Every structure is written in structure tokens, then in C-alpha cells.
Amino acid sequence: MWFKNLQIYRLPAPWAITAEQLETDLAPHAFLPCSSLDMQSQGWVSPRENGALVYTLNKQIMLLLGTEKKLLPTTVINQVTKIKAAEIEEQQGFKPGRKQMKELKEDVTDELLPRAFSIWRQTWVWIDPVNGWLVVDAGSPAKADEVIKLLIKSVDKLPLDTLHVVQSPVAAMTQWLLTDEAPSGFTVDQDTELRSTGEGKATVRYVRHTLEAEDVQRHIAAGKQCTRLAMSWADKISFVLTESLAIKRVAPLDVIKENTDTTAQNDDERFDSDVMLMTGELSRMLADLVQALGGEQAKK
């Protein structure tokens, strides 16, 4: 298994916490299925089938957030409420008032919830306490925030911070394209997005298209800046760096795939192998990326 997206946070390096302590902290917030009246439920689930909420290997930690959400469209609630309101109007001789309609809508929701379908999703969390990384495999900050909020609620005085670098991703990516020179250890791939800083926010996107230096430089000279850039690191991992320092479309390249343990006998052994390989390579990639962005800002 490999993370596809990286929402990156910082912890002290090293972060002194044991798996046993973290397990104790997470246990009160373990996932419970929705009750008949719940629209949504979230909590920690076991990354493997052994029931433990904390998976550890080679000093790396994996957590898994489970989310169940009931599918009850507003249109359905409104339709049923409208039918029941008409029945009440016929009985009492006048239309229900605003307060009565509000109560009726709540009653309809409670009535329909037990019959609503559920959808489930899982969000992976990787903690590297040695190097001080906390990474959420989420495609959007909102999804990552769900994890962080529950983690802060679970772990007392969690020493978590956002990642602050000296040079903004936008400035760095624009400079790399302007000079036609990627930072050491990285290469620029074929996808990019250039956006104007003006009111119109004019945007140019290259998708699987060779980036011609003169063409890109012309757009930059016209006032556009790079907001997304496809890159590869050490010929091992491809990804897209965004203006917010989120990393998307993470994928191991052939060199990594060739190192995958083919001797694994079962799912647990394959999972162990994948985690060890992924966390080791991503930890090194993140360190190199921070260096390419001028290093981390000094804490005030």
C-alpha cells in the first residue's frame, strides 16, 4: 500500500511517545457504527485485523480513521415532509407554521435515518516519530482536518504544527521553471499549472505535455506563477507539488516496484514490506523537498 496524497504536518524530532501510550490515548475514541439516529460516526479503527489501533514497524506508526456517513438526501427529506405537511393541513384546516414545519422535518429525518444507506471511508495516517513527520493520506485539507481534530482530541497536548518552509512552493516552482533547472535530486515532469496573479486568474495547464522552456518563460514573464508542478524524486517517486505544500498523485516508480518484497507469504507480510519501503523513501523525499524549498523556517 502506498499513500496517494500527502498532507504534511510537523512533530518534534524525535517525538517521545510509545505505541502503548498512543494505543491508550486512542482507545476512548475507537470507531463505533452509527446508531439509528446518527448521521455520521468517526473513530479509530485497526490498521490490521489484530484489533490494535496502533500499527508499528521499524519505529514507524500507522493509524487509520474510519468514517461512516448515512446517505439521506435533503430532497428526500423535503419530499416526505411536504407530504406529511399536506396531511396535517387537511386535518387541522390550515397550513403548519414555521415552528411546526421545523419539528416535522426533524421527525421525518429521525424516521428515515434507520433506513438510510451508509457509506464508509478510511483515512490513513503515517507518523514518523524519529524524523518528526505526521502525514495524512487525504486529497483535501478538509479531509485531513477531520483526522487532526480527532487526533488532538485523543492525544493530550499533541505537539503538532504545520510545515513552514523558507521559500513558498509557488515562488520555488516558478523559479525552477524560469531557470529550466530542477533542484538537486528532482526532475520536472510533464504536468504543470500556471496562474495569473491578476483579478481574472487566467490559468494555463499542461497535461502530459513536454514543457518547452521558452513557452513557459513567456507565461511567467506575462505575470503567471506556477501553482502545480509534476516532479519525480531520485527516479523513485513521482508526485505533484501544489501551492499549499500538499503533495498529490504520489506513485512509486519502477525502481521502487522492483524492490518490492516478492517473498511475502501473506497479506500481513506484504503490508509490513510496503510500509517499511514507503515510509523509508517518503521520509527521505520529504527531507530533500524541504531542503529544495530553502529549509524550514526557524521557530520564533
Curated annotation (Swiss-Prot):
**Keyword hit for Cytoplasm:** yes
* Main location class: cytoplasm
Per its UniProt record, what InterPro entries does this chain match?
A: RdgC
Q: Which GO terms describe its cellular component?
A: bacterial nucleoid; cytoplasm
Please provide, alphabetically and separated by semicolons, the GO molecular function terms listed in this UniProt record: double-stranded DNA binding
This protein's source sits in the domain of life called Bacteria
Which family does this protein fall into? Belongs to the RdgC family.
PANTHER family, A to Z:
RECOMBINATION-ASSOCIATED PROTEIN RDGC (PTHR38103:SF1)
HAMAP family, alphabetized? RdgC
Provide the function of this protein: May be involved in recombination.
Supply the name of the protein: Recombination-associated protein RdgC
Q: Species name for this entry?
A: Herminiimonas arsenicoxydans
Instruction: Write the gene name.
Output: rdgC
